[in-house]
A protein has these predicted regions:
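Short glycine/proline- and aromatic-enriched beta-strand/turn motifs that initiate or cap beta-hairpins
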Residues: 34-85
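Residues that define the transmembrane beta-barrel architecture of outer-membrane proteins
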Residues: 39, 60-64, 71, 88-92, ...
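Repeated loop/turn-to-beta-strand initiation elements of outer-membrane beta-barrel proteins
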Residues: 41, 74-79, 102-108, 143-152, ...
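Outer-membrane beta-barrel pore domains and translocons
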Residues: 46-50, 80-84, 99, 109-113, ...
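Detector for outer-membrane/organellar transmembrane beta-barrel domains
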Residues: 74, 125-198
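Outer membrane beta-barrel transmembrane domains
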Residues: 186-222
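Outer-membrane beta-barrel "beta-signal"
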Residues: 214, 218-220, 240-253
């Protein structure tokens, strides 16, 4: 019985991956009217001095984040990756999100971390017992009329296992505030915490603050061209760590 349910969950994870790929492949063959309005496709890339996510450090060097995106109305699908320039971290992600009434965004993401030697990886190993994937469901409340957001996310399937080998359901909550200046620069402050014994605290501690972030977003201006940049100070009280990162952004959108 357990094997049957495990196979069903693995099949569900595979369907998510194939569904995202199919969307990205088939959508261009839509109506001519939509094509005349401009392509819903765009490519984006971020170059960051260090990969820090939710108070956790990934890799030891500057990291490149390329992404292929499809956006139509409130729907967004993305194929993205993360590659540290010294090879200390690799990541391949699939994501879907849908925003309801410019207020609530529901998301489903698949995170996969290839090893340093790619030939040893098995992307389609989807069994619950030994898969390298992590599937996360999330909900973000961010009304356009309020300069704040509240995010709740949970790892619902995959390699997120506790010390007993059971699914840990690592859960993260984040409350943030953003101030927009008259010149469109943005200053954000976020407070994030894990809500259970998950990977944010190495499956050893329950609720803890793991991410305090102060971020400033602006542009470098070259004649009429503006290059988006950001600087972030990140503090992880649980791990007694702090980081400062700088990022530049490129997009065809």
């Amino acid at each position: 019985m357990n094997n049957m349910f495990g196979n069903m969950r693995a099949y569900g994870s595979l369907k998510l991956s194939l569904f995202i790929v199919c969307i990205l492949c088939l959508k261009p063959f839509g109506s001519r009217a939509q094509a005349n309005e401009g392509s819903p496709w765009y490519v984006s890339c971020e170059l960051s001095s260090k990969y820090v996510w939710r108070g956790l450090e990934y890799g030891k060097s500057p990291t490149l984040f390329p992404s292929i995106n499809y956006e139509s109305g409130s729907f967004l699908a993305a194929l993205s990756g993360a590659y540290a320039v010294d090879g200390s971290h690799q990541e391949v992600d699939l994501g879907l999100s849908y925003t309801i009434k410019d207020m609530v965004t529901l998301g489903l993401n698949d995170y996969f971390f290839p090893s340093a030697v790619g030939q040893n990886d098995s992307y389609f190993r989807l069994r619950h017992s030994d898969t390298g994937h992590n599937v996360e469901a999330s909900a973000t409340f961010a009304p356009t009329k309020l300069p704040m957001w509240l995010k709740l996310s949970c790892y619902v399937y995959g390699a997120d296992k506790d010390s007993t080998g059971k699914q840990a359901y690592s859960t993260y909550a984040e409350l943030g505030y953003q101030y927009v200046f008259k010149n469109e620069d943005k200053l954000s402050l976020a407070l994030g915490a894990n809500l259970n014994k998950g990977f944010y605290t190495d499956y050893e501690r329950g609720a803890n603050v793991v991410n305090i972030m102060l971020k400033y977003e602006s542009w470098f201006t070259f004649n009429k061209f503006r290059l988006p940049v950001s600087a972030s100070y990140v503090l992880n009280p649980y791990r007694n760590k702090s980081y400062f990162t700088f990022s530049v952004y490129f997009s065809t959108k």
